[in-house]
């Protein structure tokens, strides 16, 4: 058995040394030794799964480790630097050997060059600091979903965030075979200023080594760049899943309540600002996870599990009317980290929270007052648009009882959403798995939200709402999704949803809570309890099935006029959409499977035939089952 290296042992306290000796994993010891030689910390602390150790991490965060207490018990706040407020796509790169090509759409750098650069920035970055070593588990414990992970960081805020978001994994590491695979994350915030923020953000790097399942992160504190178990681990998991025949997706998991108290589990992928959280948190439904899901096949069925145990959510516009469950958790005693909000009199405030904000306080820019401007003359908002909350799912009243089931839950239906003002109907079911993956998931577009008033936004392509995190060639990623239904007896139906359809005067055609009716209809379709109308691109609801749901669930009279406007088949716009998406594949995705082009051809032929028969617009009342 390989002993702990002397350079590591001499920096450990007795409790940390005993804990590390219990794990006895040569690959882990080698990773820690390399990190210590590289970053040169003064001390090393290793943390177990115990509540005592988790509390110790929180105390470190509050004792000069990047967080400050708020008046409500358990609540803390954290500020990232003004130039460190979000994920950095430009500085996030894959480290690839010369014989590995992920395609031009993925940001990469030569592995040797990239390792030299990021390790140069990490060299000596923990001098005078304490290195923290934490162990986590992605997916439920004691499960085929479980992936062990180790995080090394000098930021107690990062470690504290992970203790909320992630399942503990130290005991898992103790039982690992010596040759077991695990994910590795090394982070240093680098040199910090008097506010504890990274000074050298221009040298921010987030480099992903797919060969060693390792992520290096330096000169940054924003959780999306530093908390390894979030999107950094998703990139590693997509690569691992591709090798092993399962899926890692940027999806929520929710329980939709059908007749006779039936629960059907849906998964959903939405680009940012397209209704993902509001769907997963619909009143009367249950949530398992809001962000990342793993998928496995067992005995002819598809199962999924939430990778995390918490939420790192955007807090802007969270209010008691639109988000009652989340809002209640955020204003109740319990462990919550608020990042980049406005703080005044020991309370957190954010834009869109449903009350009047103080005119003074502190935020990510320092002392703040209403009307304060930055160096460029722009008014500084009270809270950043990407301000966040970090909370355990167990704090939510609507957590599903199967959330920690090591088997996961069966996938009843799949939803793909986007932001589209003029083309897609509010909900449509694909004809089959192949068309669902290709025409719903692999054809997602989301209009930019900063469009000029009176104009439609510019459609931005975002494959499966996962494009930023795909770590394999996009064509292979599509093929993996297509192949995943192989051996599944009845693949779950796939639906597209669109909550942003507008009329000719740019008024939204659907209400905020109408999405509940769309999902309840989809739940009935999963069980074959309602018929549907056939369009060139899929199945849409009948009016007579929606009207009773609107009345029963929303106490709303649903008119035939509203139905016709919402579910009008916009043939010309659909033809334009699929022309546009196909061109993207031909220009930018050289390994696109031929079945993608064949499917686009079939869909376009059906649309052309429908236009010859009905014209550019098809009323749903002209369609048949």
Residue ranges of predicted features:
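Short, glycine-/Ser/Thr-/acidic-enriched flexible segments
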Residues: 51-52, 139-141, 239, 257-261, ...
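Conserved NTP phosphate-binding and transfer environment spanning the P-loop NTPase/kinase superfamily
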Residues: 13, 68-70, 81-82, 87, ...
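N-terminal accessory targeting/assembly segments
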Residues: 2-182
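Charged, amphipathic alpha-helical linker segments immediately N-terminal to NTP-binding catalytic cores
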Residues: 177-250
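Catalytic or ion-translocation cores adjacent to nucleophile or general acid/base/metal-coordination motifs
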Residues: 259-345
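Phosphate-binding P-loop
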Residues: 245-248, 254-263
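Extended, Lys/Arg-enriched charged tracts that mediate electrostatic binding to polyanionic substrates
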Residues: 115-145, 218-237, 241, 378-390
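Short acidic, glycine/serine/threonine-rich loops at helix termini
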Residues: 56-59, 144-150, 279-282, 298-302, ...
């Amino acid at each position: 058995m390989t002993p702990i290296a002397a350079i590591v042992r001499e920096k450990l306290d007795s409790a940390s040394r005993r804990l590390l000796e219990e794990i006895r994993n040569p690959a882990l010891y080698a990773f820690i030794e390399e990190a210590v030689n590289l970053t040169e910390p003064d001390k090393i602390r290793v943390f177990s799964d115990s509540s005592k150790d988790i509390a110790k991490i929180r105390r470190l965060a509050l004792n000069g480790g990047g967080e400050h207490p708020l008046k409500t018990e358990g609540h803390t706040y954290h500020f990232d630097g003004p130039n460190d407020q979000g994920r950095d796509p430009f500085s996030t790169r894959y480290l690839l050997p010369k014989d590995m090509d992920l395609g031009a759409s993925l940001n990469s750098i030569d592995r040797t060059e990239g390792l030299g650069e990021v390790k140069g920035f990490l060299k000596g970055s923990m001098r005078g600091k304490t290195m923290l070593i934490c162990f986590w588990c992605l997916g439920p414990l004691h499960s085929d979903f479980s992936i062990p992970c180790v995080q090394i960081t000098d930021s107690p805020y990062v470690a504290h965030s992970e203790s909320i978001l992630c399942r503990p994994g130290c005991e898992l590491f103790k039982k690992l075979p010596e040759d077991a695979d695990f994910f590795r994350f090394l982070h240093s915030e680098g040199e910090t200023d008097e506010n504890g923020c990274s000074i050298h953000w221009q040298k921010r790097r987030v480099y992903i080594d797919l060969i060693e399942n390792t992520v290096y992160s330096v000169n940054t504190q924003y959780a999306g760049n530093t908390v390894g178990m979030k999107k950094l681990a998703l990139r590693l998991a997509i690569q691992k899943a591709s090798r092993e025949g399962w899926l890692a997706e940027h999806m929520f998991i929710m329980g939709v309540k059908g007749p006779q108290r039936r629960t059907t589990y849906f998964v959903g992928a939405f680009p940012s600002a397209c209704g993902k959280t509001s769907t997963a948190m619909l009143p009367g439904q249950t949530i398992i996870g809001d962000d990342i899901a793993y998928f496995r096949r067992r005995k002819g069925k598809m199962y999924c599990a939430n990778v995390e145990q918490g939420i790192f959510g955007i807090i802007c516009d969270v209010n008691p009317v639109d988000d009652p469950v989340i809002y209640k958790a955020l204003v109740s005693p319990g462990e919550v980290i608020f990042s980049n909000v406005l703080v005044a009199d020991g309370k957190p405030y954010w834009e869109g929270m449903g009350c009047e904000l103080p005119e003074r306080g502190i935020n990510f820019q320092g002392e703040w007052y209403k009307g304060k401007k930055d160096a460029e003359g722009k008014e500084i908002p009270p809270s950043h648009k990407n301000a966040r909350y970090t909370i355990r799912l167990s704090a939510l009243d609507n957590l599903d009882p199967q959330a920690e089931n090591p088997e996961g839950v069966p996938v009843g239906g799949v939803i793909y959403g986007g932001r589209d003002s003029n083309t897609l109907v509010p909900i449509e079911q694909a004809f089959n798995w192949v068309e669902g993956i290709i025409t719903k998931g692999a054809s997602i577009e989301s209009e930019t939200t900063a469009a000029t008033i009176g104009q439609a936004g510019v459609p931005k392509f975002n494959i499966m709402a996962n494009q930023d995190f795909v770590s394999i060639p996009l064509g292979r990623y599509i093929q993996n999704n297509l192949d995943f239904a192989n051996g599944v007896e009845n693949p779950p139906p796939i639906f597209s949803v669109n909550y942003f359809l507008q009329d000719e005067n740019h008024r939204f055609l659907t209400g905020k809570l109408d999405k509940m009716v769309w999902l309840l209809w989809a739940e009935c379709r999963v069980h074959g309890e309602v018929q549907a109308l056939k369009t060139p691109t899929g199945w849409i609801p009948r009016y007579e099935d929606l009207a009773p749901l609107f009345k029963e669930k929303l106490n709303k009279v649903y008119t035939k006029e509203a139905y016709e406007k919402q579910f009008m088949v916009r043939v010309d716009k659909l033809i334009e959409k699929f022309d546009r998406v196909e061109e993207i594949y031909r220009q930018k995705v050289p390994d696109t499977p031929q079945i993608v082009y064949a499917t686009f051809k079939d869909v376009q032929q059906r649309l052309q035939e429908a236009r010859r028969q009905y014209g550019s617009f098809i009323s749903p009342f002209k369609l048949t089952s």
